[in-house]
Amino acid sequence: MSGLLKFITCGSVDDGKSTLIGHILYDSKLLYADQEKALELDSKVGSRGGAIDYSLLLDGLMAEREQGITIDVAYRYFTTEKRSFIVADTPGHEEYTRNMAVGASFADLAVILVDAKQGVLVQTRRHARICALMGIRYFVFAVNKMDLVDYSEERFKEIVDQIQELSKELHLASVKIIPVSATEGDNVTTHSDNMPWYTQEPLLAYLENIDVSEKKQEEGFYMPVQRVCRPDHTFRGFQGPVSYTHLRAHETL
């Protein structure tokens, strides 16, 4: 499937969003040699005890690297042989939900991560609802950390039931559920030998092939507000990205 795919990664805290995208970039050979070397060096002092920490490819702020979390929205552009992508890697903490909502406002598809040990959590549900409210029609639920549940098909089916219940509640039409391990690479870019019971496409192949051309383009002015700016009591401004319109200076909205 040709054409640009804009998607968001979201979900609850520590579900592995940055690690997943970092592993896609790493496995797809989309890094320069100096980037790979820097990743190896940074991982030695990171939060994974010396093992390669793929999340460092997305976590750019010093505070993010020190704490092992995502705070801001990290946008990355990459291209495979089949498709070009822009991904918005968003934070999972509740206090940064507004940043997640801004990332969702630009996306055609949402990749929502679910921890295989914990299942669907409150923040998982919140992010799915926000994505639906933002008009996203295509959803991929990546059931991550399958290595921590011994790649159990039974556990995967339990979480599938939770996701299907959520999808029904939110009236989600297009839903794909894929079992993955972002740290180990299972079903991220290639099929997993650890999960022979899953015979469908791995995540990257699904993203390369899905057709999102039916997404309805909204008309008129559309600007998700990320921040209210009040330098003093005489002024109130709004900051955020502008989509689906063309503006001119001094134009009245």
PLM feature spans:
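Conserved beta-strand/loop subsegment of P-loop NTPase cores
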Residues: 110-113, 136-146, 167-180
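Short, structured beta-strand/loop micro-motifs enriched in basic residues and often containing a Trp
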Residues: 231-240
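Helix-rich terminal scaffold detector
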Residues: 6-10, 19-21, 25, 113, ...
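Single conserved hydrophobic/aromatic residue that forms the stacking wall/gate
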Residues: 246-253
